[in-house]
């Protein structure tokens, strides 16, 4: 198994969308997966694109990916990367591919002068939790993740300041 890892290019977007749908199914979140090639292109390659990514290839087959974007810790005053997704297809798990992707993301962050990588893991995904802890990640047990989406976002955005 000779796996190469490189930056995602525009020609990879259909593969990334396919892998994202697989990932959503794995995480039991398929009903929320609305990504399209066009949306991904806008986020990654348009003039105001802000998402970066890596793809792992076994020959001509995309077998894993990672997506990330800039973030900022206000209390620490530090810029970092937010690891939005890292996903490895089932047949390629347990072959150090996750570790290779994570190391490459850390190198990218370091080369940009960034000092942290933040991410979330679903509570039930024990293999992922163990993976990140094994590599030295800190678990912030006292935090809860919230979001405004759909009607709640629209309502909030239409209220006067």
Question: What do these predicted ranges mean?
Answer:
Residues 88, 94-107, 134:
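Conserved acetyl-CoA-binding loop-helix of GNAT-fold acetyltransferases
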Residues 115-118, 122-161:
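C-terminal "cap" of GNAT-fold acetyltransferases
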Residues 55, 61-70:
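Conserved beta-strand in the GNAT
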Residues 17-42:
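Conserved GNAT-fold acetyl-CoA-binding loop/helix
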Residues 43-55:
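A short helix-loop-beta-strand connector motif used in the catalytic cores of GNAT acetyltransferases and
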Residues 4-18:
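A short beta-loop-alpha structural element at the N-terminal edge
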Residues 72-83, 93, 140-141:
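A conserved beta-turn-beta hairpin within the catalytic core of GNAT-like acetyltransferases
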